[in-house]
Amino acid sequence: MRTMALLATLLLSTVAFPMIASADVCSTVDVLEFDGNNANESVTTQVEFGPRIPGSNASMELRNWFMETRPEFDWRLDPHHRGGYNLTNLEGKLTPLDSTDETPVIVLAAHYDSRHRAERDPNPDMTEQPIPGANDGGSGVAVLWELARIIPTLNLDHEIWILLTDAEDQGSNDDPSTWVLGARAWAENQTQDDINRTDAFLLVDMIGDADLKIYRTFPPSLNNEEGNR
């Protein structure tokens, strides 16, 4: 039940964060303590750091801010050199007092970098400028930052890992291998024990749209099964 409460909080946060004016949703979120205003304010903080391009001072400031404001977690910087970038993943762990080598794990993840160029901007004068990253990058971090305030109070029976990955959005549209570099590095360094203990991996990304639409997607192997339901 305690783990389900965390999952419910996360799911509600993805609804309540961009639409905090909804009375029905907010009354539920109040019970679970997720504060959409806190999350929104943290987006402002992130944007004020500047573009979070891998290796930048803004990236370092964001990592330091996250660690300093959420000291209940055991934080670790995980640097890599991939695709021409010096990137740094940030991983924090919160373990129950009775944790063992077999305690199950829930991973909550988001990327914190912002793209180095806005090639889709309708203003041609802006296409070579970095994006602010309020939604793409900032919104996922905001949800995890607010959840990191709540989680230590829930007395969960799982280990909770918060993972902020770097160099996710710096790739070339012509080469899929140049994207999600931080996540690839993290995944490649997971041990078999880590994999066996992981009960859930939840990725939060781009949930800050004013007109948020969340679509259900299925692996190809499930398409026929879903269509028959």
Task: Describe these PLM feature segments.
Residues 1-24:
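Secretory targeting signatures
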Residues 32-39, 55-63, 85, 133-141, ...:
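Solvent-exposed, acidic/flexible segments
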Residues 39-42, 48-49, 90-165, 174:
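Catalytic-core environment of secreted peptidases
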Residues 45, 49-52, 65-73, 115, ...:
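Structured segments of extracytoplasmic/periplasmic soluble domains
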Residues 52-54, 81-84, 98, 112-116, ...:
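Solvent-exposed loop/turn segments at secondary-structure junctions
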Residues 88, 104-106, 198-202:
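A generic secondary-structure signal marking the coil-to-beta-strand transition
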Residues 128-226:
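Acidic/histidine-rich catalytic neighborhood of metal-dependent amide-processing enzymes
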